[in-house]
Amino acid sequence: MQHFIGIDFSGGANAGRKIWIADGRVEHEALLIETCLQGEALPGSSRQRVECLAALRAFIRSADAALIGLDFPLSLPADLMKGQTWLQFIRLFSDCYTTPQHFRQACLHAAHGRELKRRTEIETKTPFSPYNLRLYRQTYYGLRDVIAPLVRERAVRVRPMQSRRLGVPSLIEICPASTLKQLQWYCPYKGRSIAQRAARLTILRSLQRVGVQLASQLKPIVLADPEGDALDSILAAWAAYRSRSQLDRLPHDPLYQREGYVFV
């Protein structure tokens, strides 16, 4: 496996501005990030969500055997899946939930007002439930407009719910914040202050020490992004890279097969 991509996702109306994609390949036993661009820069894309997500699907389809890290939930807690397998759940997702608001309210109703977490979210200490107020739009549009169409087309394999298939991109769920916290690298890095820009530089230097290299033109782009989304996409690509050997060693756990697994 030589090709690794990280996608910092957004379900916002101007998703093309918020989504960032880092594309890297292995070179001399290191991960070289060759490009890091906004979703609106993809061929056929725009700042608007509908056009951007269509372009993102096309980009993922064309990624051959890449391992792609996505930073949104790829499933729900098993208690909310109505006894379905993951494949049944994803195929019926758009029929079950007509809007992001309907999705959040249906989950809250089924959970008796609680924000349930999946086992993997508890294990990796991700900050939010998939239908938390800050995350539910991201979950909804990610599942409905990215994952479900690609799965129906058999254009991708979503791990660990599906087995690997040669020549087809593998998608995994990652969480940049959890990765940073696991490595004890976390510090407030989102914002326009000098301290927050310095924190982005510190994280980039930490990545460099573990073998992540950036094409020369990318460093100023990443440091200048005050929202930290460009950096998050690079962290997502690196999380995919460092998870490559873990994929085939992950225990065959029925709960992970339904709820998914966050690779940090």
Report each predicted region and the residues it spans:
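RNase H-like (RuvC/DEDD) metal-dependent nuclease/polynucleotide-processing core
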Residues: 1-5, 9-264
